[in-house]
Amino acid sequence: MSQITPTTYEEFLALAAEGTVVPLVKTVMADLLTPVSAFLRIERQSPRAFLLESVEGGEKIARYSFLGCAPHTIVRARGSQVFIERANGNQETLQRPMLDVLRDLMREHKPVKVAGLPPFSCGAV
Protein backbone atom coordinates (compact mmCIF):
# COMPACT_ATOMS: atom_id res chain seq x y z
CA MET A 1 0.00 0.00 0.00
CA SER A 2 1.27 3.49 -0.78
CA GLN A 3 0.44 6.75 0.94
CA ILE A 4 1.17 10.32 -0.05
CA THR A 5 1.94 12.93 2.61
CA PRO A 6 0.38 15.49 2.93
CA THR A 7 -2.79 13.49 2.30
CA THR A 8 -5.07 16.27 1.02
CA TYR A 9 -4.69 19.41 -1.05
CA GLU A 10 -6.02 21.45 1.86
CA GLU A 11 -3.32 20.01 4.14
CA PHE A 12 -0.71 20.89 1.52
CA LEU A 13 -2.00 24.48 1.33
CA ALA A 14 -1.92 24.80 5.13
CA LEU A 15 1.71 23.64 5.17
CA ALA A 16 2.58 25.94 2.25
CA ALA A 17 1.38 28.89 4.32
CA GLU A 18 4.13 28.06 6.85
CA GLY A 19 7.08 28.12 4.45
CA THR A 20 8.32 28.06 0.88
CA VAL A 21 9.19 24.35 0.52
CA VAL A 22 6.75 21.55 1.39
CA PRO A 23 8.04 17.98 1.25
CA LEU A 24 5.70 15.80 -0.76
CA VAL A 25 6.38 12.20 0.24
CA LYS A 26 5.07 8.96 -1.18
CA THR A 27 5.75 5.84 0.86
CA VAL A 28 5.83 2.60 -1.12
CA MET A 29 6.76 -0.98 -0.37
CA ALA A 30 10.09 -1.56 -2.08
CA ASP A 31 11.50 -4.74 -0.61
CA LEU A 32 13.28 -5.63 -3.85
CA LEU A 33 14.23 -2.10 -4.90
CA THR A 34 17.68 -0.93 -3.84
CA PRO A 35 18.76 2.73 -3.86
CA VAL A 36 21.02 2.03 -6.84
CA SER A 37 18.31 0.31 -8.88
CA ALA A 38 15.90 3.17 -8.07
CA PHE A 39 18.55 5.66 -9.20
CA LEU A 40 19.06 3.80 -12.48
CA ARG A 41 15.32 4.12 -13.18
CA ILE A 42 15.33 7.84 -12.42
CA GLU A 43 18.54 8.48 -14.35
CA ARG A 44 16.92 7.29 -17.58
CA GLN A 45 14.45 10.17 -17.29
CA SER A 46 16.76 12.93 -16.03
CA PRO A 47 20.39 13.53 -17.00
CA ARG A 48 20.88 15.46 -13.74
CA ALA A 49 19.67 12.71 -11.44
CA PHE A 50 21.69 12.00 -8.31
CA LEU A 51 21.98 9.45 -5.52
CA LEU A 52 23.49 10.32 -2.15
CA GLU A 53 23.81 7.59 0.44
CA SER A 54 24.97 7.76 4.02
CA VAL A 55 26.70 4.55 5.02
CA GLU A 56 28.62 5.55 8.13
CA GLY A 57 27.42 7.15 11.33
CA GLY A 58 24.98 4.81 12.99
CA GLU A 59 21.20 4.55 12.95
CA LYS A 60 20.53 8.31 13.14
CA ILE A 61 22.72 9.29 10.20
CA ALA A 62 23.53 6.27 8.06
CA ARG A 63 20.09 4.99 7.18
CA TYR A 64 19.04 7.35 4.42
CA SER A 65 19.41 7.43 0.65
CA PHE A 66 18.52 10.62 -1.20
CA LEU A 67 17.38 10.39 -4.81
CA GLY A 68 16.74 13.48 -6.86
CA CYS A 69 16.29 14.76 -10.38
CA ALA A 70 15.58 18.00 -12.22
CA PRO A 71 17.31 20.26 -9.67
CA HIS A 72 15.88 23.72 -9.00
CA THR A 73 19.35 25.28 -8.85
CA ILE A 74 22.87 24.05 -9.57
CA VAL A 75 25.83 25.81 -7.97
CA ARG A 76 29.40 25.20 -9.11
CA ALA A 77 32.64 26.86 -8.12
CA ARG A 78 35.92 27.13 -9.96
CA GLY A 79 38.64 29.11 -8.27
CA SER A 80 37.10 32.34 -7.01
CA GLN A 81 34.13 32.19 -9.39
CA VAL A 82 30.74 30.77 -8.46
CA PHE A 83 28.35 29.74 -11.23
CA ILE A 84 24.61 29.53 -10.54
CA GLU A 85 22.26 27.84 -12.99
CA ARG A 86 18.49 27.93 -12.34
CA ALA A 87 15.95 25.48 -13.72
CA ASN A 88 14.32 28.32 -15.67
CA GLY A 89 17.56 28.81 -17.64
CA ASN A 90 18.79 31.91 -15.79
CA GLN A 91 22.52 31.84 -15.11
CA GLU A 92 24.86 34.09 -13.21
CA THR A 93 28.53 34.19 -12.33
CA LEU A 94 29.65 35.70 -9.03
CA GLN A 95 33.01 36.64 -7.57
CA ARG A 96 32.21 35.80 -3.95
CA PRO A 97 33.14 33.07 -1.50
CA MET A 98 31.17 29.90 -2.26
CA LEU A 99 29.86 29.52 1.31
CA ASP A 100 28.49 33.08 1.27
CA VAL A 101 26.66 32.36 -1.99
CA LEU A 102 25.21 29.13 -0.56
CA ARG A 103 24.03 30.92 2.60
CA ASP A 104 22.25 33.55 0.50
CA LEU A 105 20.62 30.90 -1.68
CA MET A 106 19.43 28.95 1.36
CA ARG A 107 17.78 32.09 2.78
CA GLU A 108 15.43 32.02 -0.23
CA HIS A 109 13.87 28.80 1.03
CA LYS A 110 12.06 27.97 4.24
CA PRO A 111 11.33 24.22 4.44
CA VAL A 112 8.26 23.18 6.39
CA LYS A 113 8.68 20.48 9.04
CA VAL A 114 6.16 17.67 8.66
CA ALA A 115 5.49 15.39 11.62
CA GLY A 116 6.62 11.83 11.09
CA LEU A 117 9.25 12.59 8.47
CA PRO A 118 13.01 12.23 9.04
CA PRO A 119 14.94 15.30 10.24
CA PHE A 120 16.15 15.98 6.69
CA SER A 121 13.33 15.27 4.26
CA CYS A 122 13.83 18.09 1.77
CA GLY A 123 16.32 20.78 0.94
CA ALA A 124 19.67 21.37 -0.68
CA VAL A 125 22.09 18.53 -1.22
Where are these regions (language model features)?
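Signature of the chorismate-utilizing enzyme
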Residues: M1-V125
